[in-house]
Amino acid sequence: MEMTNAQRLLLSNQYKMMSMLDPENAERYRRLQTIIERGFGLQLRELDRDFGELPEETCRSIIDIMEMHHALQVSYNNLKDRQDIDARRLEFLGFDAATEARYLSYVRFLVNTEGRYTHFDCGSHGFNAQTKMWDKYLRMLAVWHACPRQYHLSAVEIMQILNA
């Protein structure tokens, strides 16, 4: 992260104020203040992650993924014959915190801050699937988008999406 001295001073002051306003997180803010003031390059990269950018297209894809899971659950609940579909496979697992942290962060924002998809079970890991999911979800989306009635899926369509 490249910052001028003036920008570093402003950010340092912000962290100082935050440490006073939020005593529970004061230690974290003081640490960040020190990193900014001293310009520790390695630790400044942490801030890059905090201030990363998630393009609009990616945000829309994540919402689409979550909407697909909602449609899977609604369709499953409306089925008369569930044909051995394991309901656990319908759950939205989230994303891998180690490799897909930006996606995971957006999911948590949507659920916890925006109040969307609050009916999804975040599990004990808070939507951390602990394995890469992005490519799997994109394959599932391709199949879901090809379905003529996306919110009234048959058991066969549900299985095709899950097995994508």
Curated annotation (Swiss-Prot):
It comes from the Bacteria. This is UPF0304 protein NT01EI_2691. It comes from Edwardsiella ictaluri (strain 93-146). Belongs to the UPF0304 family. SUPFAM superfamilies: YfbU-like (SSF116960). HAMAP family: UPF0304. It holds the Pfam family YfbU.
